[in-house]
């Protein structure tokens, strides 16, 4: 058997063994995709004992290609929500998550200096302790750029594997410990979270209001500032027994009922100006109007603002709200459409069908992947990561590297959505498939390279010390920030658990947090809020630590 055939066969075996290990769960908790790393270590140990020779060049290419696929698809997935997560609504959660990353970096730096841990080893421990595989790839990339010998770079994968198990268990232990310390009643926390969402959350809501302000009588909707802005959409108007879709030129009269869509605070302001909320239904049932959700798939409307499409004027159809990457938004006129946006339309059936034709609404296109934008994005990301930045006093030019360059480019492209007829939307199933393939390839090679010396390092070397260092890097930031968030910020426990899981980009921890109260979405919401920014920081941090430690010797 040729070296290439043998290498591919061994990688396939690693994937099978690793995925099997990852699917084994104890009380609902398993290693998940991280099991591939340990599958690689097991197979790598026996490959080394048998004296088999694998193609090192091929292993290197597969490892890098796997990292490229994984990081790029993560960036495309979280791109639409990344910049939104930096806004005020998620600012507090992101600040605490960033603090966890910073404290973890400081603990790593202190351990490196106190115990004189080799740079590749301490970076591997850091990456494993925070259960972040892209950080491992980014760290190995920067070490190679700094001229570190390959045998030293491979040690990073071994130390990563030592620290990884407690990285998963440590966050679960932290959640349990915080629950005990603060005597948390999970049911009460879930009720409080639901109450805060209902009363003050930045969710999109609807209300029906009666026009009671005499100053608004006989005014066109476009002449009422609060109805002509970008924060509230008036999608239906009922006068006596007639329900219709209002246009900007529609005249409102005293006693009219308006169906408004917006955030709670803005709707409250509308009540102060227009009139009181009423219980009267403005349902389209048994009327000539209907409400329908339509998906944007037509390349000709991508990048165009809603107001420039003139749906109200041409078709008498109102877009009441927009769902982008799972986030509900008010469909203001200045929003530019992206591929995959889901629009809530209100109008007559024939008019809605006409608008749907303009927007595309081709469900099958959501299952198709445009490969040209994928490779354009990967190429641009690699180029961005290769741009050197020379800083006086540093031993090597700073680069974002494969991981950093691809992540930033994918975040930007995911946020832009489309350029002309090129769109960077990727169906969730396709994104997940490429992401899983990439991480399996990457971890398989890392495990294989680490497996030869893993057992000896654990039994006769410093493996146990590495596990202890990793436990500190995992536990200290989580416990510190968890206590601060609960005591100072009075953060909801379920929200805090989601934030802690997101700060470690740890899906098993999110599964554990969700199971604390299966019907509450608090943990998932906070996890999604901090995940994009934290993923970016986790990939950048080992590169910054590597350059810093290298420069100060």
Curated annotation (Swiss-Prot):
<dbReference type="GO" id="GO:0005886">
    <property type="term" value="C:plasma membrane"/>
</dbReference>
<dbReference type="InterPro" id="IPR050144">
    <property type="entry name" value="AAE_transporter"/>
</dbReference>
<keyword id="KW-1133">Transmembrane helix</keyword>
<feature type="domain" description="RCK C-terminal 1">
    <location>
        <begin position="191"/>
        <end position="276"/>
    </location>
</feature>
<dbReference type="InterPro" id="IPR006037">
    <property type="entry name" value="RCK_C"/>
</dbReference>
<keyword id="KW-0812">Transmembrane</keyword>
<comment type="similarity">
    <text>Belongs to the AAE transporter (TC 2.A.81) family. YidE subfamily.</text>
</comment>
<keyword id="KW-0813">Transport</keyword>
<feature type="domain" description="RCK C-terminal 2">
    <location>
        <begin position="279"/>
        <end position="361"/>
    </location>
</feature>
<feature type="transmembrane region" description="Helical">
    <location>
        <begin position="65"/>
        <end position="85"/>
    </location>
</feature>
<keyword id="KW-0472">Membrane</keyword>
<feature type="transmembrane region" description="Helical">
    <location>
        <begin position="393"/>
        <end position="413"/>
    </location>
</feature>
<feature type="transmembrane region" description="Helical">
    <location>
        <begin position="431"/>
        <end position="448"/>
    </location>
</feature>
<feature type="transmembrane region" description="Helical">
    <location>
        <begin position="533"/>
        <end position="553"/>
    </location>
</feature>
<feature type="transmembrane region" description="Helical">
    <location>
        <begin position="158"/>
        <end position="178"/>
    </location>
</feature>
<dbReference type="GO" id="GO:0008324">
    <property type="term" value="F:monoatomic cation transmembrane transporter activity"/>
</dbReference>
<feature type="transmembrane region" description="Helical">
    <location>
        <begin position="95"/>
        <end position="115"/>
    </location>
</feature>
<keyword id="KW-1003">Cell membrane</keyword>
<feature type="transmembrane region" description="Helical">
    <location>
        <begin position="464"/>
        <end position="484"/>
    </location>
</feature>
<feature type="transmembrane region" description="Helical">
    <location>
        <begin position="4"/>
        <end position="24"/>
    </location>
</feature>
<keyword id="KW-0677">Repeat</keyword>
<dbReference type="InterPro" id="IPR023018">
    <property type="entry name" value="Transpt_YidE_put"/>
</dbReference>
<dbReference type="InterPro" id="IPR036721">
    <property type="entry name" value="RCK_C_sf"/>
</dbReference>
<feature type="transmembrane region" description="Helical">
    <location>
        <begin position="371"/>
        <end position="391"/>
    </location>
</feature>
<feature type="transmembrane region" description="Helical">
    <location>
        <begin position="28"/>
        <end position="48"/>
    </location>
</feature>
<dbReference type="Pfam" id="PF02080">
    <property type="entry name" value="TrkA_C"/>
</dbReference>
<dbReference type="Pfam" id="PF06826">
    <property type="entry name" value="Asp-Al_Ex"/>
</dbReference>
<feature type="transmembrane region" description="Helical">
    <location>
        <begin position="493"/>
        <end position="513"/>
    </location>
</feature>
<dbReference type="GO" id="GO:0006813">
    <property type="term" value="P:potassium ion transport"/>
</dbReference>
<dbReference type="InterPro" id="IPR006512">
    <property type="entry name" value="YidE_YbjL"/>
</dbReference>
<protein>
    <recommendedName>
        <fullName>Putative transport protein YidE</fullName>
    </recommendedName>
</protein>
């Amino acid at each position: 058997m040729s070296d290439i055939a043998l290498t591919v066969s061994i990688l396939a075996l690693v994937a099978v063994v690793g995925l099997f290990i990852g699917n084994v769960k104890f009380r609902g908790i398993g290693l998940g995709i991280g099991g591939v790393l340990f599958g690689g270590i097991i197979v790598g140990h026996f490959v080394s004992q048998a004296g088999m020779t694998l193609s090192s060049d091929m292993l290197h290419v597969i490892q890098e290609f796997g990292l490229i696929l994984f990081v790029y698809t993560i960036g495309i997935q979280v791109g639409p929500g990344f910049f939104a997560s930096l806004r005020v609504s998620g600012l507090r959660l992101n600040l605490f998550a960033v603090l966890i990353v910073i404290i973890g970096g400081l603990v790593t730096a202190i351990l490196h200096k106190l115990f004189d841990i080799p740079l590749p080893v301490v970076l591997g421990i850091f990456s494993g302790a925070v259960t972040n595989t892209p950080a491992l790839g980014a760290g190995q990339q920067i070490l190679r750029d700094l001229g570190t010998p390959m045998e030293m770079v491979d040690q990073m994968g071994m130390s990563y594997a030592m620290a990884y198990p407690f990285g998963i268990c440590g966050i679960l232990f932290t959640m349990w410990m915080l629950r005990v310390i603060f005597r948390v009643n999970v049911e009460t926390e879930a009720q409080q979270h639901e109450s805060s969402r209902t009363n003050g959350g930045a969710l999109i809501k609807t209300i029906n209001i009666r026009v009671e302000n005499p100053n608004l009588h006989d005014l066109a909707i476009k002449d009422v500032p609060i109805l002509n802005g970008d924060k509230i959409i008036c999608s239906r108007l009922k006068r006596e027994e007639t329900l219709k879709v209002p246009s900007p030129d529609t005249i409102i009269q005293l006693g009219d009922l308006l169906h408004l869509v917006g955030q709670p605070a803005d709707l409250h302001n509308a009540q102060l100006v227009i009139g009181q909320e009423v219980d009267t239904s403005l349902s389209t049932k048994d009327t000539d109007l209907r409400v329908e959700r339509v998906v944007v798939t037509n390349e000709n409307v991508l990048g165009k603002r809603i107001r420039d499409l003139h749906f109200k004027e041409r078709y008498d159809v109102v877009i009441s709200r927009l769902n982008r990457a799972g986030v509900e938004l008010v469909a203001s006129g200045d929003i530019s459409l992206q591929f995959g946006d889901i629009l809530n339309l209100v109008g007559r059936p024939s008019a809605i069908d006409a608008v749907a034709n303009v927007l595309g609404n081709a469900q099958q296109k959501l299952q198709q992947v445009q490969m040209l934008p994928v490779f354009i994005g990967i190429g641009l990301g690699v180029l961005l990561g290769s741009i050197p930045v020379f800083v006086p006093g540093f031993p090597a030019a700073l680069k974002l590297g494969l991981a950093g360059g691809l992540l930033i480019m994918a975040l930007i492209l995911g946020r832009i959505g489309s350029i002309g007829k090129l769109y960077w939307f990727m169906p969730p199933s396709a994104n997940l498939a490429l992401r899983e393939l990439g991480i399996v390839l990457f971890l398989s090679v890392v495990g294989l390279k680490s497996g030869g010396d893993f057992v000896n390092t654990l039994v006769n070397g410093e493996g146990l010390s590495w596990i202890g260092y990793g436990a500190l890097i995992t536990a200290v930031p989580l416990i510190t920030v968890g206590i601060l968030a609960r005591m100072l910020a009075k953060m909801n426990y379920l929200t805090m658990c989601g934030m802690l899981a997101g700060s470690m980009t740890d899906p098993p921890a999110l599964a554990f947090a969700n199971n604390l109260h299966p019907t509450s979405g608090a943990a998932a919401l906070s996890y999604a809020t901090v995940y994009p920014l934290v993923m970016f920081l986790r990939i950048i941090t080992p590169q910054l630590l590597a350059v810093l430690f290298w420069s100060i010797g």
